A protein has these predicted regions:
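Active-site-adjacent loops and short helices of periplasmic peptidoglycan-processing enzymes
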Residues: 1-145, 154-155
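Penicillin-recognizing serine hydrolase domain
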Residues: 2-6, 105-255
Length: 255
């Protein structure tokens, strides 16, 4: 545990903090911020504004994205479901940008939505400046506690679990192969998925969640020196949750 500068283990329904270390310390978030993009897409589907079958069109701006991508050309159409696969499994910056522009009208406007949603969730020490985590690494920040609050909200979206726990997939009739870096998603019992990764100038993070029976735990492990340490600590923290805690209802007194 000494290797991670910041982590939180939280029960997803009550937001009870089970374990933490420097949970309120500001850290660079790297590609963690894609999870807010995914959440806003899921909530747009909840409102009926979009569906997994909705076709979105790639812009010149999306095409200009560097880093991980699914090679979208300007004017190319792709369903929201496939774009989400690109983001969740492949960490694709161009797919993330297409989703952001569809929901917000522009990436700048979408970033405003990211920050307002963070405030609604009680993420009071978090700032988003763009939608991918690739370009705004020095300016964007969060805390392990704030990150865990986002994970609690994401854990409600069962329609995303299959994508979050997929190891591999493909797009464009096999032209684009997607391979997740999140090894826990398809290995940890009860996993509801999420993400691990880094950014150009941030440490490694592991954002994980799992549900067994009627209890769900999420953990945000931030600012680690390497991916293996982040993943091992996330697994250890989830084990602590499932091995040591359960949800009970207080007894109802007899009249």
């Amino acid at each position: 545990e000494e290797y991670s500068r910041s982590y939180v283990l939280m029960e997803a329904e009550t937001h009870t903090v089970i374990r933490e270390n420097n949970g309120d310390k500001r850290v660079k978030m790297g590609s963690f911020n894609k999870l807010m993009t995914v959440l806003l897409a899921a909530e747009a589907m909840d409102r009926g504004e979009l569906s997994l079958e909705t076709e979105l069109v790639a812009s010149e701006h999306a095409n200009s994205m560097q880093g991980a991508q699914i090679w979208l050309m300007p004017g190319e159409k792709m369903t929201l479901g496939d774009l989400l696969k690109g983001v969740i499994i492949g960490n694709a910056n161009d797919a993330c940008c297409v989703i952001a522009e569809k929901i917000g009208g522009s990436e700048e406007k979408f970033t405003e939505l990211m920050n307002s949603r963070a405030a609604e969730l009680g993420m009071n020490d978090t700032l988003f400046t763009e939608c991918t985590g690739y370009y705004g690494d020095d300016a964007q920040y969060t805390t392990a506690h704030d990150a865990a609050l986002l994970l609690c909200e994401l854990s409600k979206h069962n329609e995303l679990t299959e994508m979050f726990t997929s190891r591999i997939d493909e797009l464009k009739s096999g032209e684009v192969q997607l391979v997740t870096t999140n090894r826990m998603g398809h290995r940890y019992k009860g996993s509801v998925g999420f993400k691990c990764g880094t950014g150009p100038s941030s440490g490694y993070f592991a954002a994980e969640g799992a549900r067994r029976d009627d209890i769900c735990f999420v953990t945000a492990v931030m600012d680690c020196p390497d991916e293996d340490i982040a993943m091992a600590l996330a697994r250890e923290l989830l084990d602590i949750g499932f091995d040591g805690y359960l949800i009970t209802s207080p007894p109802i007194p007899d009249d």
